[in-house]
Design a protein with these regions (language model features):
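A short helix->beta-strand "capping" segment at the edge of beta-propeller domains
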Residues: 1-14, 45, 150-151, 341-343
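WD40/WD-repeat beta-propeller blade N-cap
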Residues: 10-17, 53-59, 95-102, 158-165, ...
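Residue-level detector of Asp-centered blade-edge/turn motifs that repeat once per structural unit
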Residues: 24-25, 66-67, 109-110, 172-173, ...
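Conserved strand-to-loop turn within each blade of WD40 beta-propeller repeats
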Residues: 32-35, 74-77, 117-121, 125-126, ...
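WD40-repeat beta-propellers
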Residues: 38-42, 80-84, 126-135, 186-190, ...
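Blade-level signature of beta-propeller repeat domains, shared across WD40, Kelch, NHL, RCC1
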Residues: 356-387
């Protein structure tokens, strides 16, 4: 399969990349690292860092507000930093229990709420998802006030130790939350009253990352068990599983991307061609649709819809084994699947260590890895043409 040749390398970190995010308009990339830094890259202009935000511990997560004015970052010592992006200044620092680890931060699409996933590093402890008003978080405080964490408007607690929360995101117009768990389960919770709307177990090990496409009604999850799962958001049922060939691979990150179909409006070779437009139509028999998607011609590979959905994932074997195996055995390549029929469309090796985070904006894919670099790729149609 063709590699992606248009790769831009962003170098500036001294330790592994933990999380990367695009700005809302896609013109900038933010990368968080174990070197206690968050770097902003104006990658479209050059490959140099434009600004560095500094923590006092390893930075785990980044979240950019929808209006692109505020950034929330969380670290491994239970601290959250709120930044003014326009003025590149720190608004305030919130300190939770130092035994807590900030696992995820999410801001609602209307910029009203922020949810923070917190978990202790010890095994015999539960985890929390706290919800705050953004107006409260962005309100400047004195140094003394900043030492006391603000009171959350809502708190959701894991019910058992085995179901510790990993990541939380808003869904259904901010009326509910999707929360991934360490036991491989995924649950949807009513944001108002905390009642569980749906719950299902899709993996045999911890869900390391998940992404949601509201327009297409799907959820994509990646796990330590090496599988990538595609889930129907409406029914909360499994649509299909993708299993990379490398059995040692942890799938650390996943994203959903939608691109134009290169075969749209081409003459149809087979009458059994499935369209991405009706893949998740609940009135259709999903098994019939999936079975007709395996026709060998290119039209059936991509469907005849105007757009196709890509399921992108990456990871690699545990970093402690990286020095004992070669780059190919480590499973550090980035995989691009057709979400319609599960076919692997592209696989390319770019990093020299496990990939920890993926982000996508339009046709630009960014990856951050243990090798302390961020790599930016252009998703072009020629990528999917086999030689």
């Amino acid at each position: 399969m063709n590699p992606i040749y248009k790769t831009q390398i962003l170098q500036g970190h001294g330790r592994p990349i933990k999380n990367i995010k695009f700005s809302t308009d896609g013109t900038q990339i933010y990368s968080a690292s174990a070197d206690r830094k968050v770097i902003r890259w104006d990658y479209q202009a050059n490959s140099k860092a434009s600004f560095t935000f500094t923590h006092q511990a390893s930075v785990n997560v980044i979240c950019i507000s929808p209006d692109n004015k505020t950034m929330l970052t969380g670290d491994s010592t239970g601290c959250i930093y709120i930044w003014d992006i326009d003025h590149t200044s720190l608004i305030k620092k919130i300190e939770f229990d130092p035994c807590l680890n900030v696992r995820s931060i999410e801001i609602s699409t209307d910029n009203v709420y922020a949810i923070v996933t917190l978990a202790a590093r010890t095994k015999n402890s539960k985890s929390l998802v706290n919800a705050y008003l953004m107006s409260t978080l962005t309100l400047p405080q004195s140094e003394e006030e900043g030492k006391v964490p603000p009171t959350p408007i809502k708190t959701f607690e894991s019910t058992e130790l085995s179901t510790k929360f990993v990541q939380a995101k808003f869904t259904n117009y901010n009326k509910s939350l999707l929360i991934s768990r360490e036991d491989g389960g995924l649950e949807m919770i009513n944001f108002e009253n905390g009642n569980v709307i749906s719950c299902n177990k899709f993996h045999d090990d911890i869900i390391l990352d998940f992404d949601v496409s509201f327009e297409n009604g799907i959820i994509l999850t990646s796990s330590k068990d090496g599988y990538l799962s595609l889930i129907n958001l409406n029914t909360f049922q499994l649509v299909r599983k993708f299993h990379p060939e490398n059995p040692t691979r942890n799938l650390n990150a996943c994203v959903i991307s939608v691109i134009d179909n290169p075969y749209y409006n081409m003459p149809t070779v087979s009458s059994n061609v499935i369209s991405v437009d009706n893949l998740f139509d609940l009135t259709e028999d999903i098994n019939t649709l999936l079975s007709t998607a395996s026709s060998p011609n290119n039209q059936s590979k991509f469907g005849k819809g105007k757009e196709i959905i890509l399921a992108i994932a990456s990871g690699g074997q545990d970093s402690k084994f990286v020095t004992t195996t070669n780059q190919k055995e480590g499973g550090f390549d980035i995989l691009i699947y057709n979400a319609m029929n599960g076919e692997l469309l592209a696989s390319f090796l770019d990093h020299f260590g496990p990939v920890n985070s993926l982000a996508v904006h339009d046709k630009t894919l960014a990856s951050g890895a243990e090798d302390a670099t961020v790599r930016v790729h252009k998703i072009d149609h020629y990528l999917f043409d086999k030689k």
